[in-house]
Design a protein with these regions (language model features):
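Conserved "boundary/linchpin" sites in short secondary-structure elements
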Residues: 1-9, 24-32, 54, 58-65, ...
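Conserved acidic
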Residues: 10, 14, 68
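Short, solvent-exposed loop/turn elements at beta->coil junctions and helix N-caps
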Residues: 36-40, 92-95
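Short, small/polar residue-rich loop motifs at catalytic or cofactor-binding pockets
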Residues: 41-48
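A short acidic/small-residue loop/turn micro-motif
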Residues: 66-72
Length: 127
């Protein structure tokens, strides 16, 4: 009697877990740009990037989804590009998808230093 094919194992990673791995990777590659400590209650700039990677983690597209500060946008884009290739998104997305897109938010403190929302702690309370 022929046996039924064994289904592929379910992906062990979630998008949130992958984003945390990517955020650590970006921070390790940009130590001079990281904002240490608690973020201020009123952030000078917030930049949201849409990031597309292939199966190997190569950046194929990066777009600014939201920003009101051109300088912060340039720092976010340069920091991400300097971090490439990113870790590969193993087991995420449709089975035969060649590309995966996700977003990350850069939270800027003073002097264009940032934290990534995926890993950022709480902000200081307002006055």
């Amino acid at each position: 009697i022929p046996q039924a094919p064994v289904p592929a194992p379910a992906p062990t990673r979630t998008l949130d877990a992958y984003k945390a791995v990517v955020a650590h990777h970006v921070m390790q590659r940009n130590p001079e740009r990281i904002f240490e400590g608690e973020l201020p209650p009123m952030l000078p700039a917030v930049v949201v990037l849409n990031i597309t990677v292939d199966r190997e983690g190569q950046l194929t597209d990066v777009q600014v989804q939201r920003s009101r500060d051109q300088g912060a946008s340039e720092v976010a884009l340069a920091s991400l590009r300097r971090s490439g290739p990113l870790p590969p998104p193993d087991g995420l997305g449709p089975q035969h998808a060649d590309l995966m897109t996700f977003s990350e938010t850069f939270l800027f403190g003073e002097r264009y230093r940032f934290q990534l929302r995926t890993l950022a702690g709480p902000q200081r309370a307002g006055l």
